[in-house]
Amino acid sequence: MEHQSLSNIGITPLSNALGAEIDGVDLSQPLEKAQFEDIQKALCTYGAIGFRNQKLSHQNQIDFALRFGTLEVHPIVKGMEEYPEIIRMHKPAGTPASFGVGWHSDNSFFDKPSLGSIVYAETVPPVGGDTLFANQQLAYDMLSNGIKEMLEGLIAIHSAKDAYTSPSALEKYDSDGPISYNRSDIIEDFIEHPVVIRHPVTGKKALYVNAMFTHHFKDWTVEESKPLLEFLFAHTTREELQCRFKWEKGSLLMWDNRVVQHAALNDYVEYDRTLYRVTVNGTKLI
């Protein structure tokens, strides 16, 4: 996994599987063409890229995200009043539940799932709260030829219903809490995506199922789907597919939702944390 830089930015891989930290760039300032091209290529190469010691306004974060495409206003999770594209993910000290716990790809229940998520850290705990990532291209490559052949052409059904109707989720609807949900018909939708997709830029194949939002296979019953899905959920999050990002104040992290799963660790109950997420709209997966 190697990327040839066109500009003066530095790239340090986080693991053999995926992930890199990028230095030599101030995201509060307009990016030069060569800098942005390097960042785009690094995202495609490493799947998740982090930037340290950034001092960003909300508008800075939006401006950076807009370089990658149009921005999402989430149909369920309420955005900030002044910046509806930004979700403020605030977890006060003493709060047991956390947002984004469990392996998933953001918004795989959309007909056109998110291209990427961009998260900026304002307040972080002194320890804990790391985010894990898993490379779904490598997960596909590690499968036997026999199961690859079986998965070709298989369609998975994705749904937000289980995740957004759990007891902890129901408390967030129309609430004044740190994270609040809107009521949306999208929760009732069942969306089809191929189990094996191709990255629209690199053309590499990747697995596209996740334990949070993948419900069953098309033309299979839930019971029939369960054994294969359980295998895939375990396989796609194996340790050798992972990297780990430790948050610091001023960190910004972007990941490619099409070929990377992530999971937030909820191991900092006694501390505050505030992150801001912007999500770039994607296209239909094939």
What residue spans do the PLM features occupy?
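Non-heme Fe(II) oxygenase catalytic core, chiefly the N-lobe of the double-stranded beta-helix
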Residues: E2-L252, R258-I286
